[in-house]
Amino acid sequence: MTETPIVLNVHFQAAPGHEKELGAQLRALVAPTHEEPGCIIYELHFDPEDPSKFMFYEKFASQAAIDHHVSTPHFQRFQSYLQANNPLAAQSLTKWRGIQ
Protein backbone atom coordinates (compact mmCIF):
# COMPACT_ATOMS: atom_id res chain seq x y z
CA MET A 1 0.00 0.00 0.00
CA THR A 2 1.37 3.40 -1.01
CA GLU A 3 1.45 6.10 1.64
CA THR A 4 -0.76 9.11 0.91
CA PRO A 5 1.11 12.43 0.90
CA ILE A 6 0.72 14.54 4.04
CA VAL A 7 -0.35 18.18 3.99
CA LEU A 8 0.58 20.48 6.86
CA ASN A 9 -0.99 23.86 7.44
CA VAL A 10 1.14 25.81 9.91
CA HIS A 11 0.10 29.24 11.22
CA PHE A 12 2.36 31.70 13.03
CA GLN A 13 1.47 35.00 14.62
CA ALA A 14 4.42 37.20 15.50
CA ALA A 15 4.57 38.86 18.87
CA PRO A 16 4.53 42.68 18.65
CA GLY A 17 7.83 43.98 17.30
CA HIS A 18 8.90 40.60 15.84
CA GLU A 19 7.01 40.71 12.53
CA LYS A 20 9.93 41.54 10.20
CA GLU A 21 12.47 39.22 11.81
CA LEU A 22 10.03 36.31 12.02
CA GLY A 23 9.13 36.83 8.36
CA ALA A 24 12.82 36.78 7.41
CA GLN A 25 13.42 33.62 9.42
CA LEU A 26 10.44 31.89 7.80
CA ARG A 27 11.52 32.95 4.30
CA ALA A 28 14.97 31.47 4.97
CA LEU A 29 13.36 28.02 5.31
CA VAL A 30 11.78 27.97 1.85
CA ALA A 31 14.66 27.43 -0.61
CA PRO A 32 16.51 24.69 1.32
CA THR A 33 13.25 22.88 2.08
CA HIS A 34 12.40 22.76 -1.64
CA GLU A 35 15.60 20.72 -2.10
CA GLU A 36 14.67 18.08 0.49
CA PRO A 37 13.72 14.59 -0.65
CA GLY A 38 9.97 14.09 -0.34
CA CYS A 39 9.09 17.80 -0.33
CA ILE A 40 6.26 18.30 -2.84
CA ILE A 41 5.07 21.81 -1.87
CA TYR A 42 6.45 24.28 0.67
CA GLU A 43 4.83 27.70 0.33
CA LEU A 44 4.95 30.63 2.72
CA HIS A 45 2.00 33.03 2.77
CA PHE A 46 1.20 36.18 4.72
CA ASP A 47 -2.04 37.89 5.72
CA PRO A 48 -2.29 41.09 3.65
CA GLU A 49 -4.45 42.67 6.35
CA ASP A 50 -2.29 41.67 9.33
CA PRO A 51 1.51 41.71 8.88
CA SER A 52 1.98 39.67 12.05
CA LYS A 53 0.36 36.53 10.52
CA PHE A 54 2.13 33.94 8.37
CA MET A 55 1.09 30.54 7.06
CA PHE A 56 2.99 27.63 5.53
CA TYR A 57 1.19 25.29 3.17
CA GLU A 58 3.35 22.17 3.07
CA LYS A 59 2.99 18.85 1.27
CA PHE A 60 5.38 15.98 1.90
CA ALA A 61 5.45 12.53 0.30
CA SER A 62 5.50 10.71 3.64
CA GLN A 63 5.92 10.96 7.39
CA ALA A 64 9.57 9.97 6.82
CA ALA A 65 10.00 13.09 4.66
CA ILE A 66 8.54 15.25 7.45
CA ASP A 67 10.81 13.57 9.99
CA HIS A 68 13.79 14.35 7.75
CA HIS A 69 12.62 17.97 7.32
CA VAL A 70 12.51 18.64 11.06
CA SER A 71 16.02 17.19 11.47
CA THR A 72 17.68 19.42 8.84
CA PRO A 73 20.19 22.12 9.85
CA HIS A 74 17.99 24.94 8.49
CA PHE A 75 14.95 23.75 10.47
CA GLN A 76 17.06 23.30 13.61
CA ARG A 77 18.41 26.87 13.20
CA PHE A 78 14.81 28.09 13.03
CA GLN A 79 13.93 26.18 16.20
CA SER A 80 16.94 27.73 17.95
CA TYR A 81 15.79 31.18 16.80
CA LEU A 82 12.33 30.53 18.28
CA GLN A 83 13.78 29.40 21.61
CA ALA A 84 16.25 32.28 21.87
CA ASN A 85 13.93 35.12 20.80
CA ASN A 86 10.39 34.11 21.80
CA PRO A 87 8.95 35.83 18.69
CA LEU A 88 5.54 34.11 18.62
CA ALA A 89 2.22 35.25 19.99
CA ALA A 90 0.56 32.10 18.61
CA GLN A 91 1.32 29.01 16.53
CA SER A 92 -0.81 26.13 15.26
CA LEU A 93 -0.29 23.09 13.06
CA THR A 94 -2.94 20.99 11.34
CA LYS A 95 -2.04 17.73 9.59
CA TRP A 96 -4.10 16.48 6.64
CA ARG A 97 -4.19 13.42 4.38
CA GLY A 98 -5.99 13.18 1.06
CA ILE A 99 -9.15 11.15 0.70
CA GLN A 100 -8.69 8.38 -1.82
Language model region names:
Residues 1-5, 44-50, 80-100:
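Glycine-rich beta-strand-turn "strand-cap" elements at beta-sheet edges
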Residues 6-12:
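Active-site-flanking beta-strand signature of metal-NTP-handling nucleotidyl enzymes
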Residues 10, 22, 42, 54-56, ...:
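Hydrophobic packing within well-folded, soluble alpha/beta domains
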Residues 13-19:
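Short, surface-exposed ligand-recognition loops at beta-strand->loop->(often short) alpha-helix junctions
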Residues 16, 50-51, 61-64:
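Short, charged/polar surface micro-motifs in flexible loops or helix N-caps
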Residues 31-55:
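Short, glycine- and small/hydrophobic-rich beta-strand elements in well-ordered beta-sheets
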Residues 32-40, 59-93:
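An amphipathic, aromatic/His-enriched active-site/gating alpha helix that lines ligand/cofactor pockets
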